[in-house]
Amino acid sequence: MVLRNSLLKLAALALGAALAFTSANAGKLEDIKAKGTLVVGVKNDVPHYALLDQKTGEIKGFEVDVAKKLAKEILGDENKIKLVAVNAKTRGPLLDNGTLDVVIATFTITPERKKIYNFSQPYYQDAIGLLVLKEKGYKSLADMKGAKIGVAQAATTKRVIGEAAKKAGVSVSFSEFPDYPSIKAALDAKRVDVFSVDKSILLGYVDEKSEILPDSFEPQDYGIVSKKDDAEFAAFIDKFVGQNKAQIDNLAEKWGL
């Protein structure tokens, strides 16, 4: 009887270990289908892309629509989705710790980032620009000697504009902010001289006192981002973007991009 009980305990332990192994090694697609919800990191402060509606509490925009389309592809229902607000500093860590399944948040594809995350092929391309107060009289980056440029934390903008300024022989400094509204507020208060980010994002912040300069810097390709450890899920997302690119382009046009 003792032997029989011991064998039963061993069998139970083996079964538990097998189930745990299966769960731990289940692909992300299967995990999403099992829980019935796609969790997506999106911005909530970027007009046209993903902006929080203060009246309804909903985040709306181009990238939200792309996220819904992906949810429909995986789960058959675009409403089976949970949106989590992120910024350039938080989107990576929230993906790393498993809070998010994917990130669709103006996440620029770079060689360095591709070593850490899986990126789909680009679903949208933009270029970095410069938003300034009209009263400053700036016409291009070449006029900005000694200017303080406001950029988002953990974004590619600081590197790109820093390199462009050096090439133009212009000395500039940078102030980093957690979100875009903070940069615009700093520009309006003249705590920074320039607000720099991708041009289509700047379009949501331009007003009668400001203007976007003609300068464009380094094309920015946006990809849907997933964790590096699931190549099958990454391939699924990449195929989704490729097969739906025309419809995604239509969504961008719908949102004025």
Q: Model-predicted segments: where are they?
A:
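Acidic, polar ligand-binding/catalytic clefts
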Residues: K68, K80-D143, K209-S216
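Bilobed "Venus flytrap"/periplasmic-binding protein-like clamshell domains
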Residues: V39-D45, I59-I74, T108, G129-P178, ...
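Extended ligand-binding regions for polar small-molecule ligands
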Residues: D65, K69-E73, A142, A147-K148, ...
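Extracytoplasmic small-molecule ligand-binding "clamshell" domains
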Residues: K33-V103
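Ligand-binding clefts/hinges and TM-proximal coupling segments of bilobed small-molecule sensing domains
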Residues: G27-K28, K33, T156-S175, K209-S216, ...
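Periplasmic-binding protein-like
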Residues: N44, Y124-V132, K199-V241, K245, ...
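Sec/Tat signal peptide C-region and signal peptidase I cleavage site
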Residues: F21-A26
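A ligand-binding cleft/hinge motif common to bilobed small-molecule-binding domains
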Residues: T90, T106-I116, V160-A165, A185-E218
